[in-house]
């Protein structure tokens, strides 16, 4: 029922919101019919540093790093910053994780605006009944230390090329808007 939208174009109409973004296109011959092209999934993109970021594209790249089992990428709000910063959640063997190699991998494979600012190491990624990765709860919990106390959260500070554990002091710097993202 939450995916059914009412009164979109006229009173009483009902539409099923699939989350797909499509556009009409001219194929050169239409025979009086409209043609549509799939563009993207709504909610699977976010804006950061005035650029559109596809969560699926970033996840596909991060999944090629040998120590990332499955990446779930989403955008999160940062105080005093426009748009949403990239964040990724994945599970891995944290003791053996090669942070320097991962940081270099991210810098080489992704443009700066698409590089995750935050990383959350989690026990297990949740999926829907159709095996899509769940993002809503992760997006809401984001990097907030009071909501993710059991997980390890890392941050890439502005101007730096490595991920470091997010501690309470730097969390406060982020929350008061003076981190400079």
Task: Give residue ranges: language-model regions.
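AMP-binding/adenylate-forming catalytic domain of the ANL superfamily
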Residues: 109-133, 150-176
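Short, charge- and proline-biased low-complexity linear segments
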Residues: 20, 147-152
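AMP-binding/adenylate-forming catalytic core of the ANL superfamily
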Residues: 2-114, 124-133, 137, 167
């Amino acid at each position: 029922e939450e995916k059914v939208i009412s009164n979109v174009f006229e009173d009483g109409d009902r539409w099923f919101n699939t989350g797909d973004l499509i556009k009409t296109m001219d194929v050169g011959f239409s025979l009086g019919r409209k043609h549509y092209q799939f563009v993207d999934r709504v909610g699977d993109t976010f804006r950061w540093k005035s650029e559109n970021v596809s969560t699926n594209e970033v996840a596909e790249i991060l999944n090629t790093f040998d120590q990332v089992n499955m990446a779930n990428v989403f955008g999160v709000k940062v105080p005093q910053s426009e748009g949403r910063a990239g964040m990724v959640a994945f599970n891995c063997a944290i003791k053996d994780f090669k942070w320097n190699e991962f940081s270099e991998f991210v810098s080489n494979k992704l443009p700066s605006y698409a590089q995750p600012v935050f990383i959350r190491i989690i026990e297990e990624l949740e999926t829907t009944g159709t095996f899509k990765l769940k993002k809503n709860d992760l997006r809401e919990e984001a990097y907030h230390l009071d909501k993710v106390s059991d997980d390890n959260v890392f941050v890439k500070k502005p101007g730096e090329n490595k991920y470091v554990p997010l501690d309470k002091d730097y969390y406060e710097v982020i929350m008061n808007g003076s981190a400079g993202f």
